Amino acid sequence: MKAEKLDFSNENCYCVTLNVIDWVDVFIRPVYKNAIVDALNLFAEKKGLIIYAWCLMSNHLHLVARSQEKHQWPYILRDFKRYTTKEILAELDNEKEPDCRRKWMMQRFESPVNVTRQLAKYHFWQDVNHQEHCPANDPANIMQKIITIHQNPVRALLVDQPEAYILSSARDYKGKRGLVKVELFKILHYKK
């Protein structure tokens, strides 16, 4: 089967899941959760990332987003992964709040020299992203993706309503202020 060629124009959205190496449950401590929230806000404010929806689970991050500038999506995603890797590894090294799982996690994140061609000593995110192109001319599909990612904490039995989960944009869609700057996706603004 031929791989889908992604259209990186700025009109289109992408539904992306970034998974932590070995599915390590990193995002159970506030310091690591805050690193992702801060990075999402930084990239939304300064790097041209337009976020329609997000949801941070214990070992992965879901995003429905696009780039402000044409053809910049792959670079924004790459830079986001690099930046968050650096920030989270720095927090793991933080002596003020030591994590008892530090040694074990660092072993998981260590790059095997014979497998990767990259020079990074550690990898935090899996190299392969689950990334789906969501054409701007199919707003119903985009809205369905947003609803699906907001349901993740409910399916994981963390909350009974999506908007009760603070590490998600579901609360923004219910009129509450969330932790990350999101642009609400309004299906009425798009024509088929």
Regions found by a protein language model. Name each.
Residues M1-K192:
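Short catalytic/metal-binding and nucleic-acid-binding patches
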